[in-house]
Design a protein with these regions (language model features):
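Helix-loop-helix "hairpin" substructures at the membrane interface of multi-pass membrane proteins
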Residues: 81-159, 182-188
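Glycine-rich phosphate-binding loops of nucleotide-dependent enzymes
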Residues: 18, 22, 79, 119
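Membrane-helix interface residues
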Residues: 3-5, 33, 37, 107, ...
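Alpha-helical transmembrane segments within multi-pass membrane transporters and channels
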Residues: 5-48, 55, 187-192, 196
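Transmembrane helix-bundle core of multi-pass membrane transporters
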Residues: 32-106, 133-136, 198
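Short amphipathic alpha-helical coupling elements at transmembrane boundaries
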Residues: 30-35, 73-76, 112-125, 197
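Transmembrane alpha-helical segments in multi-pass inner-membrane proteins
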Residues: 4-16, 135-145, 149-199
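Membrane-embedded alpha-helical segments of multi-pass transporters/permeases
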Residues: 2, 19-23, 27, 58, ...
């Protein structure tokens, strides 16, 4: 949107760019903290998020904008009116949820991630390359974060601080659903959404 690229090209490029950014963050900032308490890693990533947000202000200022490919109007599903961006985001979230479930249950990479998340030492004793799994995990996280950024941008206005809203909602979701449970996180997210809607 900022550089005037076609919408489809922007969507195609944002995913690998997110993966590369996630990979670089792991290599440069997270890997040196391997073996340190979880709180140290969390503080590092929060600090890095603040720095990246500051760079966004320097480059583009505080301007907000809408994604140019966001569908307008309303979709009628029987008696129900649905905002297109919200419907697309919901379906995409379900697809990502299913893909992650399949990844963690039926693939070697996914199973390795689960073992590493549970215990680094056990993972190493089983021959799992912990550092490699970390790199893959962060690259995947960056890619999914990029996709989520596009989906959120289809519903809300894109601003430099839009990530803070997701962070503020993400922590309660993790506490409700659990740190290692994708279905639990999904249920926690739905519960939080219902609570916000009713509140």
């Amino acid at each position: 949107a900022i550089w005037g690229l076609p919408a489809w090209l922007g969507i195609v490029l944002v995913v690998p760019c997110g993966a590369v950014l996630g990979f670089l963050i792991e290599r440069l900032f997270v890997r040196p903290l391997l073996g340190q308490p979880f709180l140290s890693v969390m503080m590092m990533t929060l600090m890095l998020a603040t720095v990246l947000e500051g760079l966004r202000y320097v480059i583009r200022g505080a301007d907000s904008f809408k994604l140019p490919f966001t569908p307008g109007g309303l979709w009628q599903l029987g008696p129900v009116s649905v905002i297109p961006g919200t419907a697309i985001s919901f379906v995409a979230a379900l697809v990502i949820f299913v893909l992650l479930l399949l990844l963690f249950r039926y693939t070697k990479v996914g199973l390795s991630m689960r073992v590493v998340a549970a215990d680094h030492e056990v993972a190493q004793s089983l021959g799992i390359r912990v550092k490699r799994v970390f790199s893959i995990s962060w690259a995947m996280s960056g890619a999914f974060a990029a996709v989520c950024g596009v989906l959120v941008g289809m519903v809300f206005t894109v601003t430099p601080v839009m990530g803070e809203v997701g962070l503020g909602n993400g922590l309660p979701v993790l506490l409700l659903g659990g740190l290692t449970s994708i279905p639990g996180a999904m249920v926690g997210g739905i519960l939080l959404g219902v609570i916000e809607a009713l509140g």
